[in-house]
UniProtKB/Swiss-Prot annotation:
NCBIfam families, A to Z: S20
GO terms, molecular function: small ribosomal subunit rRNA binding; structural constituent of ribosome
HAMAP family: Ribosomal_bS20
Cellular compartments per GO CC: cytosol; small ribosomal subunit
Gene from which this protein is expressed: rpsT
Annotated source species: Rubrobacter xylanophilus (strain DSM 9941 / JCM 11954 / NBRC 16129 / PRD-1)
The organism's taxonomic lineage, starting at the top: Bacteria, Bacillati, Actinomycetota, Rubrobacteria, Rubrobacterales
GO biological process annotation, one example: translation
UniProt-annotated stretches for the region Disordered: 1-22
Name of this protein: Small ribosomal subunit protein bS20
């Protein structure tokens, strides 16, 4: 098998896998801010914990940069502190 073909196949596979993780992160972020806007602090805390795990895992696998994960989680904390 020619190397470029294999590389294309690997890239496509990684892209699909990483895209699903990034989509999940975006959805968790939206879910957090929706809960916060609705005034449901308990739900927002729960989603924040779920998001922390997901962001840390994605950063550990190199899907997103670790500084981006840290920045997002810090903003979640500040938003919660401002409301709570």
């Amino acid at each position: 098998m020619p190397a470029p073909t294999k590389r294309e196949r690997q890239n496509r596979k990684r892209f699909e896998r990483n895209r699903s993780v990034r989509t999940r992160l975006r959805n968790l972020s939206k879910k957090f801010y929706r809960a916060l806007d609705a005034g449901d602090l308990e739900s927002a805390r729960s989603v924040r914990d779920e998001a922390q795990k997901a962001y840390d895992k994605a950063a550990g696998k190199g899907i997103i940069h670790r500084n981006k994960a840290s920045r997002k989680l810090s903003r979640f904390d500040r938003a919660l502190a401002g409301r709570g």
